[in-house]
Amino acid sequence: MPDRLQLSPARLPPTPGPCSLWHMVQRLKYSYGADPSQWGELFLPDPPAAGQLRGVVVVIHGGYWRSTYGAELGEPLAVDLAEHGMAAWNLEYRRAGNGGGWPATFQDVLAGIDKLAELAGQHSLDLGKVVAVGHSAGGHLAVWAAGRGHLAGPGPGAELADPGGVRLAGVVSQSGVLNLAEAERLNLSNGAVANLLGGSSSEFPRRYRCADPMAALPLDVPVYAVHAEADDDVPLAMSALYVDASGAGGVPAHLVMVPGDHFDLINPKSPAYAVCRELAARLLG
């Protein structure tokens, strides 16, 4: 059985309190490519003490990889994280319907994370403490990006490999789609996986192997697979199957059950989201 944790905010160490004034959070938008969807917005709390560096949380929004949804879903999370003393990078990327899909969506996520290397000096970012919080399809992309080291070599995804890229130190997946084979079998969101990858697994087996976080196990970084108990959009199996498979070597993932539904996970006022925030803070150390 998967390693299940029942957590509530009361059982986790508190993060720093929010800034006394919301406008003290600095917002800076940067492009990492020429496409209108290739950008991120950096949310910064008060500067660290002189000579000190701070980690950063990459926020990756969901929407079943479709262009109908964008980074506006991640913005409230990025604001909240910054108000609680954490730098946050709200990442936009090309999706199916606006130039994304295979391989553009995956290229953008890696390039967007790598943009932090360019920004690190200016904003005192610690590239050894870059973690991700991803919701739904964004959870898939976050956990997939954590396994980028598996892309090197002659296997699937070698064209996406970059040995010099920024590596994630951990992930909080919020009801993430972490098993693409099962998601395809269940035909989640009317064929969202096939829409992302340009066809079925029988047509493009190599793409599916590259894109599936299951194929990158074992990972050498921690993953908290947070799942809402009343989630009707992404089945619990998406998290549970991944966590169960993670136990064979590497760093075991943890299944964290929280109250609420799919969208409570991205509501900064909900207890479900509060658990996600605390786990992100835990990963940053």
Label for each model-derived stretch:
Residues 46-53, 57-80:
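Short, surface-exposed "cap/lid" segments of acyl-processing enzymes
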Residues 261-271:
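Catalytic histidine-centered segment of alpha/beta-hydrolase-like enzymes
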